[in-house]
Amino acid sequence: MSGRVTPVRILGSLAASFVAWLVLRPLVGEGVAAILALGLGALALRYVPRAVLLRMLWTVPLFGLLLFVTVQLMFHVPGSPFASEKNTTEEVRKQQEELYGIPQKGFVGGCKFFGRYVHHLVADGTMGPCIKVQGRSVTDVLLPALPISFSLGLMALLLATGAGLTLGVRAGLRPNTLTDYGSMGFAILGVSLPSFVIGAMLMVVFALGKPWSWFPVAGWGSFGHIVLPAVALAMPYAAYIARLARSGTIEVMNQDFVRTARAKGLPEREVVMKHALRGAIVPVVSFLGPAAAGIVAGSFVVETLFGIPGIGRWFVNGAVNRDYYVVLGTVILECALVTAFNLIVDLAMPLLDPRLRGKA
């Protein structure tokens, strides 16, 4: 057991269960969501460290604050979901807004909409109707897009971690050499260019270019469709991970225990795998949480650029068309994915760094 049962542990596990139930209920149904949420809460109460549960306790108010700010931003931006419809009188537009529960613009209207939305989300387990797709709910349109965005984000994160660790460790083992300069040059280039610029360049070279038309321009359905957008999302974070891994490797290789291991005659490969790689992984793993959030934000533009029918594309379409329910639905799902990944990182850090186990 991770620790004795305290009010913080109980409240933290309840918060984890509530957030899981809130997100899963529109996707898998009330019964399955309740079972999964209760199981998650029981596991959290028994095994999750107190510090992580304390963060989970703050998840509920932060989750609500994020939704509130999103609603207020939408209600202070000019435009209406029905403003683009031609040959529609003002009276008909007002009736449509009343039908979809959309009050007047402004702070008060945003507060009313936020209250109704949270009430329906908690009481009914629905994310609302999709305004621009008649007869379909937000859950209906986002559920098929969720595995697409998840697989794209996971592939990008794996590429960023693998490439960044490889370049960073090699540079850290050979500082001030051609390998080091080449790796850091890649890092500077990757950090300087945003994902959508990298994506456009990759599309021109490897999809539209006649000599190297290896990958499809846009769409989804085969492994080739995921390569270019995943590389575009991964490259900026691979560059940053390479810098972290290089610094961690240099720091570890100058420690006394590494010199002792070498003095005992351990092979260089074993020294690198047991000590250098572990020293490089610790700062990288701590960065994976912010990297996941950045990849989620970058996927909004990259999915639109490559025509991928994921959650990010629905978010952009919802923002352009003022489809408030779709925007809030995508915010909820993306926030839940980032929160879950940050939880995994928090649980993995004490396993990699023994110094953190006493603080858990």
Model-found features: residue ranges?
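An internal, D/E-rich "acidic patch" concept
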Residues: V5, P103-L165
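Generic hydrophobic transmembrane alpha-helix motif, especially the helices
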Residues: A15-L36, L40-L43, L62, M155, ...
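Alpha-helical transmembrane segments of integral membrane proteins
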Residues: R50, L142, L146-T179, S195, ...
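Transmembrane helix irregularities
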Residues: V77, G190-L193, V296
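Transmembrane-helix boundary motif in ABC transporter permease subunits
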Residues: L38-A51, V71, F75, I131, ...
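Membrane-water interface at transmembrane helix exits
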Residues: W21-R25, G41, L45-P49, T70, ...
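Hydrophobic alpha-helical transmembrane segments of membrane transport/permease proteins
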Residues: L62-G115, G209-H225
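Transmembrane alpha-helical segments of polytopic membrane transport and secretion proteins
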Residues: M1-W58, N176-T177, L347-A360
